Amino acid sequence: MSGIKRVHVIYKTHLDIGYTNMGQTVLDSYVQEHIPHAIDLALKINTPEHKKFIWTVGSFLVDYYKRHATPEQLEKMDEAIRLGYFRWHGLAVTSHTELQSPEVLAYNLSVSRKLDRAYGVHTIAAKMTDVPGHTIALVRPLSEAGIRYLHIGVNPSSRVPRVPEVFRWRRDGHEVIVHYSAQYGQAISIPGFDEALEFAHTNDNRGPQDAAQVEAELARIQAKYPGAVVEASTLDAFAASLEKIRDRLPVVEEEIADTWIHGVGSDPYKVCRYKALCALAHEWLASGRLTDDTPGYANFMCNLMLIAEHTWGMDFKKYLADFKNWTKADFEAARRTDTTTLDLLTNRNASLVGTLEYDLRNYCGGKFSGSYSKFEASHAEQRGYLKAALAELPEALRNEAQAAMDALVPQFDARGEAIAPGVTHTIAGWQVRFGGGGEIAYLAQNGHVWVRDGELGRLQYEVFDAKDTTLAFYRYNRDFAHTGGWAEADFSKPGLETAENLRHTCYAFALERLTQTGDTVIATVRGDGEAAEEYGSPRRAQLIYTFEQDAVHCRLQWFEKDANKIPEALWLHFGFDVENPNRWKMQKLGQLISPLDVVAGGNRKQHAVEKLCYSGADGTVTVESLHAPLVSVGSRNLYNLDDKIESMEDGFYFNLFNNRWGTNFKMWCSDDCLFDFVIRIETNPQI
């Protein structure tokens, strides 16, 4: 390739803390095998004048290695770092960025800075791999942490946001150069720029190359760029070179968001408690009761960060691969049997066999040994981050956190005297009427009606069929010739077509009892009988509304939900009659972002949020979701992936649970769950 004088070669693997095995087993492999091998290889084949191999990892792995390696291993690592042979980048892990709180993200970024101080370096580059997109709210924290360059390597089957390959992502006076790749890492050369970037990636958790593979990689790249200096490099070095042409790069000021964010709805038990701990961390840090010098602070925050890390269990394909048992009876029988075999593949999985042969050989000792209990154990391990986080806190904070966790166990509330739905009640200054599903069907304050045609707190249960899952797969995914063998099993539900009586249906909940005690109204609702017995609808739920002068607190709790493998979702709808619904914004990482301001190919349908905020001439409304971050804009958009921006006329649908993901996510839920929302309304006086 003419005109290129220098080629930066980046050696990486992709860290999944799980997926290829149990998370702890994966981390052990880095401590015992991958990092020592990378260091030994670099020390063997590099010279100060000519670096052939530099291994780049997220800062978490270096920090973890420092805490678990032997003294001899640490001595070698220190030497490799001093020589520039082993290097971290500015982010600790690949995360679902929107799920992090500002405090968790601050800890994430602090890991690199702590290493920088220890070794006298200055990290300016960061990378995330696999997850296709992130929120623009990341720009300011990156910039403030000194990160100037972010590489995003997209999963090879996932939709790529329609942005320039390299651009300046700008928000509120801060910017970072973003480099997008349609793979984990692709070569890039920019017209008029005489340096190029090449990645030498190994597969997930596979560790570094050997010496022969390094030589072959360098020879391949040298042949591609005759006359150029080709050598191992770092993301920092490439980022520093890019600064020369920063002013030539296009500027993007729109949200991208995460088209994998629906995964955070797969384990409401874990996410609910994670959000509660994040809220406590915010409170403690603000008050000074917790500081970065508090014993246990780093490990507490690290465990919270690992919940937001993008890997949530073991790979369904390698460790379960049950594509046949869909009905509740068959699914329950399969769980009792526990072990699975490759006989549970269907004709839809024929192309998966080749992928499995590679995976079984490289990750599973050459044989398949599927098990429901083992697959479920990987999700229990992920929930273990909650317990591990609590264990690191000082006693007083730990007791406070444990009390908060205990309060999240739903308790059926039988209080109150019966009141009538469909008639207007005055409660704490509000005029309110309740509908036949327990929702608020009418809400007025100071003579202004905020809910007339909308609804607040409408609970719905939805099941999806093979047409939904297949259409979504072909709308969202790409490069089927190369990725289809494994991607359909990850992103769709192959075999679901054999559940021939399944039809896409949205089920309502029916009001069973409406009671009032003081300023609190309790709506007890019952799930549809067919939805509960055939699928996984909760049999009973309660919506508990507590009215204050300028706020309505809404608690949703459900009971008696069966585990179910059929694709399903639970939604709670909040629709207001505001004068200009286009003025709704979402709060992510403490920053307000419009749902209308999302690039094509980004996530225009769903987001993980802290709050929804409306400000118009008629007044202000905020909906704070304390435990359920996942929200769908304008409709129930779990499988609707048409890439259109949604109208906000119908409000927002909080997704309380879904099992859309395959891959490594939890795919069934039988927990009793609880979610709190706080609605604050201020009506503006009118002429």
What kind of region is each of these model predictions?
Residues M1-K367, K374, G518-I687:
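Catalytic-domain carbohydrate-binding cleft regions of carbohydrate-active enzymes
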Residues A298, L306-E309, F316-E560, C673:
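Catalytic and substrate-binding regions of extracellular carbohydrate-active enzymes
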